[in-house]
Amino acid sequence: MAARPIATIAAATVLVAASAPQLSTRAAPALDYDFFKTRVQAVFLEKRPTHTRCYICHAEANNGFRLERLSPGATAWNEEQSRKNFEMTSKLVNAGDPDTSRLLMQPLAPEGGGNVFHSGGRQFASKDDPNWKVLADWVNGKKL
């Protein structure tokens, strides 16, 4: 008779385990500095039709997302500046999840699935924008 309660407990344990949601054990991808330096920073510096460059507003000290100022006469950041930009920008992403990363959702138009709280305008009309895809690739761990 004692075997019956143990069998019932074992069966219940199997049922509970089988019905429990499966948690992902996959680690978030690492953010690649070289991809950031080469591809992501280029997006920040690019002039987009009807928009100012991301860099123009985000080099100001009063922004929550602050990029380093370019050195006088420079058209790109030096190594030290790029490292600082990488650290700052990394704080705005959820590695492996572009759709929950502020870096991608705030400048994306609400009609394209973006956040309504970006005062700098809509840099990207949709997730099909090539520059949005560059940022998403970086967040997803793409390497050079």
Task: Show which residues each predicted segment covers.
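Bacterial N-terminal signal peptides that target proteins for export
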Residues: M1-A10
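Bacterial N-terminal signal peptides
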Residues: I9-A18
